[in-house]
Amino acid sequence: PLTSSAASDVYKRQLLSLFNSVLLVGEHRTIIHEGIEREYILHVPENLNNDSSIVFVIHGYTGSAEGIAAYSGMNSIAEREGFIAVYPQGTIDSYGNAFFNVSYEFNDESTINDVSFIRELVKSISHEFNLKRKKAFATGMSNGGEMSYLLACTSSDLFKAVAPVAGVLMKGLKDSCELNSPVPVFEIHGTADKISLFEGDFNNEEGWGAYYDLPSTIDFFAERYQLVNKSVKQITSKESGADYDIFFERHWTDDLEEEVWMYRIEGGRHVWPGSKFKWWDDPLARLYFGSGNEDI
């Protein structure tokens, strides 16, 4: 058996480990929603004030809240920009995988309402921290990107902008997309993505359900918002030493604040932009907090 001194040391190490985990990732929380215990991670910046925003960072299919908190690097941006970062955890589907219900064909019998879950988090967190804005932002990887599109189409009253990474617009969602008010969109997508196909899968050959190609997806939102101006410019070049040729497509109109953007990564695969890809950091922050200036 441990001596009292040794037991105390073990306890201190456990507390330190827990503290470091909370510091690096965030606070693990649960909430009962529609009779189900749901989990999420909350990271609150040191410079929080009642004008701060909430940014939801949503993991992909089979992923986890902890995983995307670690690889997205969003906590460091939250500290810099002063927003609350929230990482919701999906539920487990019939195949044993964590997911968010965006009506994939193989999850078509699921009754999980992730829109309602995230809406409840927006309201409860806004109330807890006395936030004035009462509006949130969403980004996510793959399945989390599709969830971001779903929130834009169903919850424009609570979400100010979405930034899907390797996300696609499901056909069923496009057909029912409400968009009562414009929600800015910033999509980041690789042309060599073999899971969320850049060219789409309208015939559902992969089994996820029919979804649109990325150019059609971006055009859909731009047309719905009546954004009449379009520009495409190259922002990184392999010839200049970059890992990829990256093109920035921007849709806007002079009398509307909302815009639609896409970063097309030539040869990019199904990954979240890593720390060496600094090109995604500032544009993401600008979409959330800035003026939408074209100069990146």
Can you annotate each of these PLM segments?
Residues 1-14:
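Single conserved hydrophobic/aromatic residue that forms the stacking wall/gate
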Residues 15-54, 66-72, 77-80, 110-113, ...:
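A domain-start/cap signature at the N-terminus of enzymes
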Residues 57-60, 87, 264:
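Structural cue for short, hydrophobic secondary-structure segments
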Residues 60-64, 268:
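Active-site glycine-rich loops that stabilize anionic/oxyanionic intermediates
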Residues 89-113:
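Cap/lid segment of the alpha/beta-hydrolase catalytic domain
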Residues 107-129, 150:
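Alpha/beta-hydrolase active-site loop
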Residues 187-189:
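Short beta-strand/loop motif that positions the catalytic acidic residue
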Residues 191-260, 268, 274-290:
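Active-site-adjacent alpha-helix of alpha/beta-hydrolase-fold enzymes
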